[in-house]
Amino acid sequence: MKKIISKVSWIGLSVLILAGILFFAVKTGCKIATGVDDDKRFFTAMITDGGGINDQSFQQSSWEGMKKFSKDTNSRVSYVECPQTSDFLINIDKLADEHTDLIWGIGYKLADTIELAAKTNPELNYAIADFSFGDKTPENVTGVIFRSEESSFLVGYIAALMTKTNSVGFVGGIKGMVIDQFEYGYRAGVAYGAKQIGKNIDVKVQYAESFTDSAKGKAIAIKMFDDCDIIFHAAG
């Protein structure tokens, strides 16, 4: 039986972390949801890095976490969908003008914009998911990163034990630091499982160079299924 294994664990984890960490802490080409201007409750907003809040993936899980936080704490939450990178800075600036208490950037593509905004507005608080500035993190920024290689290792290990063709696949979105973690963990898990059961298992890897082109991802998977019976994707 052919199987596609997706990054469900990452999506679920993002909901829990986003909902928990919030306790500590417009319009050109974009869609914005706003609260009431005179509402004095704690106000948190998120901005997407190109995807929408209905992407059935990272952005949607983040927004679900925001809504849960709002329900649990009676705070205000909002979002801005920005399909173009050129929209990032202008809309983060608009959120700053709205006196947002905490501004979230969802995705590593927003790193430069978050860093610039944080330095420009030191009195505001910012956070970014899936990125860390390391030792250069501004004092008013929190970076949230995931140990994606660990969950991917488990997926690879299971794939090694389940494969009947001794060939499994990995489909990535855009190659880079974030998706490299998924590929590395998956390959390591397959290798560990293969060694344990005494098999040679091939791992085929291909990138779509997109997080939104589902047709290309499907085409890659269909071709990969000529040899593979299990595919793991980290592609949005």
Question: Can you annotate each of these PLM segments?
Answer:
Residues 19-21:
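Hydrophobic core of alpha-helical transmembrane segments in multi-pass integral membrane proteins
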